[in-house]
């Protein structure tokens, strides 16, 4: 899925085997791409390739996917616009590298969250976990089931929402089993 889009942008890989080495090309062009299936990986690969592309890249997703790459580009001050399932990016931006703090991965924490909720007399505190709205559907569902969830210390790090999740055995546990 990724390499086909990059070839469309005139990027060539070395041997077509992992790890893929991408050779530079000074004549990259932006593309307009309507994604047939939602894929954050394909979208991010196109956006990263578009950093050096001349012109505008427009990506249309059938469904919005996670937006960490777009938020990072925004934090870097790059010319990116996000409007629903459409992403517009003007290539050939100059930017300075910055230090990033990467929040804890919510999808990895999901197993621990459910375990704490269904295990009698248990609790867990997950600090500095990412609370990006594109990643926390599980939390919303569990809250609607009256699960014992507290979100503390909510803040932004760069463009990402993070916080500390305190979870403990819930009466909703019977509904989860």
Short names for language-model regions:
Residues 1-7, 11, 168-177:
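Single conserved hydrophobic/aromatic residue that forms the stacking wall/gate
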Residues 12-35, 52, 78-106, 117-118, ...:
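Self-splicing inteins and homing endonuclease
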Residues 30-37, 55-64, 98-102, 124-129:
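Flexible, glycine/proline-enriched loop segments at strand-loop-helix junctions
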Residues 40-44, 48, 107-108:
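Secondary-structure capping and domain/repeat boundary segments
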Residues 50, 73, 115-116:
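Conserved short beta-strand element of beta-propeller blades
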Residues 60-75:
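Aromatic- and glycine-enriched pocket-lining scaffold segments that form the walls
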Residues 109, 114-150:
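A conserved active-site cap/scaffold subdomain adjacent to cofactor or substrate pockets
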